[in-house]
């Protein structure tokens, strides 16, 4: 059975006036534009939140027997999400020494199905919980019983009731950002089995709260006679059913999976609704003609540009997701769970050979920068470029001469390589010959025949460089124009940048196809980046 669930894990909400009445059937009423708003400050977002009633609490009952039942029912469905990597069954995908002990990533039928944590959102909720405890607010978590045995077939039901005052949550995040972020950093730096076990228990509790809350929410909508298809549309999903499918069972199986449930629950805490609000065009901004777009470029002084593989296609470097691109080539050449697995850090550690056989195809060579790269360099020279966030690893921005201070290599580059074991870092040219031979570059310092030098590109499952967060926090204060060029905006957290920027900052998309829907750009140019640049330069005469 094939099920398609569209939109990524940052679930979008349709808020325009024509759909507002429908939305209110599913979620609480969205306030009008003159409703008082609060701003949430965090590492990853600067979002406007709606005011919530001080007396309103969330009551969540957790039943582990129910959770196990959800896991077993959900196991028979395969969900495919565009731009959203759901829970990965590591033991199916990767062959390592431990995988033989597991089936589908868990030891027995009673264990939770999910394998990976969505760390950004987990940390957001951790912040909330920890600050509530430290400030002795009205939040309380009471365990009425907690005995669960997973090593045998016996499972005792655990019931937990959580009461969360939403206004207090927002106030704490708003007023204690630095302190909360420091606390999360301290947690992340802790080393020791006892601390790790404590963290695992905390994450497990968060996931159970989220999944139980979403299950309860679904049951309420079902009991009210809400149409299941309309329910999924209103929270940003498209559900396609086959004959005899039980719609509510499928919805429950998908939305109560760990990552999805945590995202929805986090949205509810932030926005008092399951779906995240999306950006609309600036009503007062007129970009109805190309001439007006050119005028905007001329008047802007702090331009932020997000570039993807589309800006390098004309250089002879294939992009990743289009027809004939990198992922299609990988799919034909290798027997992988999915093409992206070649760039998954877990897969790399378990089986590095496929990546190093393919690395030759994407290793920077003698390619020359495109007209788009040269245009970004021109903006830099004219003092208009605030930052270029590039998702590319081809280093052509460096070749074009863009000031390195104005450049953020979001996904790293081949310029250096680091041993996965001893962390020795060497210049990328050191491993070039080995990669050209399609061999694994072993670490000479470890000299154990197994440790290898990994190019310092960011794999799925790895954190972005610290410089990314540092620059984002600075740039959102100064930016006056955001440009997205040649990017599918499918990989987080870079794909979140258009949402982070103040909604009154103009945004332009230059790409071969429309992306990030239902997010609205103020001007969209569907075509080649180089052609846009040529058309623009013909008008502005720089």
Curated annotation (Swiss-Prot):
InterPro entries named among the record's database cross-references: DHS-like_NAD/FAD-binding_dom, NAD-dep_sirtuin_deacylases, Sirtuin, Sirtuin_cat_small_dom_sf, Ssirtuin_cat_dom
Catalytic activity: N(6)-acetyl-L-lysyl-[protein] + NAD(+) + H2O = 2''-O-acetyl-ADP-D-ribose + nicotinamide + L-lysyl-[protein]
GO biological process: autophagy; heterochromatin formation; negative regulation of gene expression; positive regulation of gene expression; sorocarp development; sorocarp spore cell differentiation
Cofactors that this protein relies on: Zn(2+)
Region (Disordered): 1-37, 136-160
EC number assigned by the record: 2.3.1.286
Binding site for Zn(2+): 419, 422, 443, 446
One of the record's GO cellular component terms: nucleus
Residues of the Deacetylase sirtuin-type domain: 283-542
Annotated coiled-coil segments of the chain: 165-193
Active site: 411
Composition bias type Low complexity, residue spans: 8-25
Cofactor annotation comment: Binds 1 zinc ion per subunit.
A Gene Ontology molecular function term of the record: histone deacetylase activity, NAD-dependent
Keyword annotations: Coiled coil, Metal-binding, NAD, Transferase, Zinc
Pfam short name (any one): SIR2
Function: NAD-dependent deacetylase, which plays an important role in the regulation of transcriptional repression.
Family: Belongs to the sirtuin family.
Name of the protein in its database record: NAD-dependent deacetylase sir2D
Organism field: Dictyostelium discoideum (Social amoeba)
């Amino acid at each position: 059975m094939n099920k398609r669930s569209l939109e990524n894990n940052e679930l979008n909400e349709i808020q325009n006036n024509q759909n507002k009445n429908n939305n209110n059937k599913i979620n609480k009423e969205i306030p009008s534009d003159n409703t008082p708003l609060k701003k949430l400050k965090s590492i990853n977002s600067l979002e406007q939140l709606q005011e919530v009633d001080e007396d309103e609490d969330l009551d969540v009952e957790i039943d582990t027997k129910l959770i196990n039942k959800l896991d077993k029912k959900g196991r028979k469905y395969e969900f495919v999400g565009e731009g959203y990597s759901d829970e990965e069954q590591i033991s199916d995908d990767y062959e390592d020494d431990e995988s033989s002990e597991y089936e589908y990533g868990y030891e027995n039928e009673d264990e939770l199905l999910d394998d990976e944590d969505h760390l950004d959102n987990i940390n957001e909720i951790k912040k909330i919980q920890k600050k509530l405890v430290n400030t002795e607010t009205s939040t309380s978590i009471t365990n009425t019983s907690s005995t669960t045995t997973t090593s045998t077939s016996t499972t005792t039901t655990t019931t937990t009731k959580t009461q969360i005052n939403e206004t207090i949550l927002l106030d704490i995040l708003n007023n204690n950002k630095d302190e909360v972020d420091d606390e999360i950093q301290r947690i992340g730096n802790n080393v020791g089995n006892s601390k790790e076990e404590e963290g695992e228990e905390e994450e497990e509790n968060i996931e159970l709260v989220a999944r139980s809350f979403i299950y309860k929410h679904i049951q309420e909508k079902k009991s009210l006679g809400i149409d299941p298809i309309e329910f999924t549309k209103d929270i940003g999903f498209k559900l396609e059913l086959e004959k005899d499918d039980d719609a509510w069972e499928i919805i429950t199986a998908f939305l109560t999976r760990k990552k999805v449930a945590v995202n929805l629950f986090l949205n509810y805490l932030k926005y008092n609704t399951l779906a995240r609000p999306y950006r609309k065009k600036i009503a007062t901004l007129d970009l109805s003609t190309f001439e007006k777009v050119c005028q905007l470029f001329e008047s802007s002084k702090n331009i932020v540009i997000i570039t993807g593989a589309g800006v390098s296609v004309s250089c002879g470097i294939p992009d990743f997701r289009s027809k004939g691109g990198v992922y299609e080539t990988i799919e034909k050449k290798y027997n992988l769970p999915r093409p992206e697995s070649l760039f998954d850090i877990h897969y790399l550690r378990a089986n590095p050979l496929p990546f190093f056989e393919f690395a030759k195809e994407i290793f920077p060579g003698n390619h020359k920068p495109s007209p788009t790269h040269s245009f970004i360099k021109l903006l830099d020279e004219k003092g208009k470029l605030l930052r270029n966030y590039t998702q590319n690893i081809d280093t052509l921005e460096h070749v074009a001469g863009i000031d390195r201070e104005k450049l953020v290599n979001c996904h790293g580059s081949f310029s250096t390589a680091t041993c996965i074991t001893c962390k020795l870092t060497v210049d990328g040219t050191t491993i070039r010959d080995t990669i050209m031979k399609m061999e694994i570059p072993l670490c000479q310092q470890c000299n154990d025949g197994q440790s290898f030098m990994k190019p310092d590109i960011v794999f799925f499952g790895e954190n972005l460089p610290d410089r990314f967060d540092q620059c984002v926090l600075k740039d959102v204060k100064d930016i006056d124009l955001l440009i997205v060029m040649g990017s599918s905006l499918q990989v987080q957290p870079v794909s979140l940048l258009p949402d982070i920027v103040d909604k009154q900052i103009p945004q332009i998309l230059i790409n071969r196809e429309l992306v990030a829907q239902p997010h609205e750009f103020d001007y969209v140019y569907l075509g080649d980046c180089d052609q846009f640049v040529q058309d623009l330069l013909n008008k502005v005469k720089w």
